[in-house]
Amino acid sequence: LAKLERLCAAADILGCAFIRGFAFFAPEEGPLPAETLAPYFERPVRLLEQRGKTLLLEADPSVNTSNHAALARLVEAIGSPRVRAIFDPGNCLYDPLGETPYPDGYEAIRPFFAHVHIKDAVRAVPESYCVKVGTGQVGYPALLRRLAADGYAGWLSMETHYRLDSHLTEEQMRLPGGAGFSAGGAAATAESVAALKDILQKE
């Protein structure tokens, strides 16, 4: 709760209404269900109400909501307008349950998301990996058309876990940070931003 308070203070300084978060790392025995997790958000919701901020939860394979269907169940169980979701279609391709980014992931989280992350990836064994936007399995042309058709007017936030000449490790993806994570990020981001602009212009 103290960390959320600090994040609210930082958001005030930056003029941000949204704060990104996750539904806690999943225990080794498996993810907790929405009805177990929801009570843990009662005090954070009260703080968010006091500070006028909205917490946007993200689906991620390392947390209790590994996909957008699970995340939608949690947001619905919390039942507060101060807790919404991020739609991150690239994370679907790391989901151990195999959620499809579009249409399945999108349809599941559509009533709840207020922000979109952009990255592309390929589902693979033993480990999925990120690629330049538009060259993976997200299917961005169809997804972007759907976002436009549904009237989405929020941000598209580039989340570059792709690198030109290497792949980030699972641990780097789980806990990003440091020089090793950042190395090569600028060039890969520039390439993916150009690719996204190209897709948007064509669509």
Q: Model regions: which residues?
A:
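Histidine-acidic metal/acid-base catalytic patches
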Residues: 9, 15, 68-203
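Active-site acidic/histidine proton-transfer and metal-coordination neighborhood
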Residues: 1-87, 179, 183-186
